Amino acid sequence: MTNILDGKKLAKELELRLHEDITEFSPEVGRPPGLAVIRVGDDPASGIYVSNKEKACNRIGLDSFLYHLGTNTSEQEILEVIKALNNDQKVDGILLQLPLPKGLDAEPLLKAIDPEKDVDGLHTLNLGRLLKGEKGPRSCTPAGIMVLLRRNNISLVGKKVVVIGRSILVGKPMALMLQAANATVTVAHSKTINLPEITNQAEVLIVAAGIPQLIGLEHVRSNAVVVDVGIHRIPMEPLKLTGSNYKLCGDVRAEEIYSKIKAITPVPGGVGPMTVAMLMVNTVNRWQYHCGLSSTLSDLLP
């Protein structure tokens, strides 16, 4: 029977734990954790993601500060906001919501964030820490996947793991975290030749290609564990994308491979909730660090 790796359920458990930590330690340090989110422009998907993060903050008792800037905001204006947040003692974590509007380069903005407040794990220093195996904030999506696999007793030691995707958000940090867990890792991407030949070797297949329904029966070996990072809104009928005439899907054709595999993350309800949960974990962890508290979350930090 195929096991469903339920990220939504686990995320709720993590939120309860974080709420308990915040309730216990806030009186001691005089304030709850604080997360600042910078959103530039009015991308609808970004609006949904930011709303989900705000709701999670409210559930666990974390202060949320939203800076919603206009589409035409200059790089210098955003840098000024980041500088102010770096110096704000109420703020433990800073997140720059991506993607940015056309004409804005994320790289100098991410570099401007204080590495100790970089709860998305995208600062050059924190990526270097990950590469060297040093402690520091980790990218939320791959970190959430690692926790989800571990909580479902899926061992990675010596396992053949294939990661499809090489983005700085997911693919590259994912591969490094898997290597640190003693997996044997192969990274595939859009230029990979004969993808099924490679993915059929995977005992654990992590798909972060950003291509709807890319992976099907021909790509998976029997009893594989499949993690589907993608989420897409596609028409139920060609050229129609209005009202309820659409469906959500991932990078994997889940129904097609379901009977062949050992376990899979659902879309929605798998990786997405874990990404938000790990953002909360990172922020609370930074709060504990800034306030001189001992970390209570080391088991959740890859």
Swiss-Prot record:
SUPFAM superfamilies: Aminoacid dehydrogenase-like, N-terminal domain, NAD(P)-binding Rossmann-fold domains. It comes from the Bacteria. Pathway: One-carbon metabolism; tetrahydrofolate interconversion. It catalyses: (6R)-5,10-methylene-5,6,7,8-tetrahydrofolate + NADP(+) = (6R)-5,10-methenyltetrahydrofolate + NADPH; (6R)-5,10-methenyltetrahydrofolate + H2O = (6R)-10-formyltetrahydrofolate + H(+). Its EC number is 1.5.1.5, 3.5.4.9. Keywords: Amino-acid biosynthesis, Histidine biosynthesis, Hydrolase, Methionine biosynthesis, Multifunctional enzyme, NADP, One-carbon metabolism, Oxidoreductase, Purine biosynthesis. Homodimer. Belongs to the tetrahydrofolate dehydrogenase/cyclohydrolase family. Catalyzes the oxidation of 5,10-methylenetetrahydrofolate to 5,10-methenyltetrahydrofolate and then the hydrolysis of 5,10-methenyltetrahydrofolate to 10-formyltetrahydrofolate. This is Bifunctional protein FolD. It comes from Prochlorococcus marinus (strain SARG / CCMP1375 / SS120).
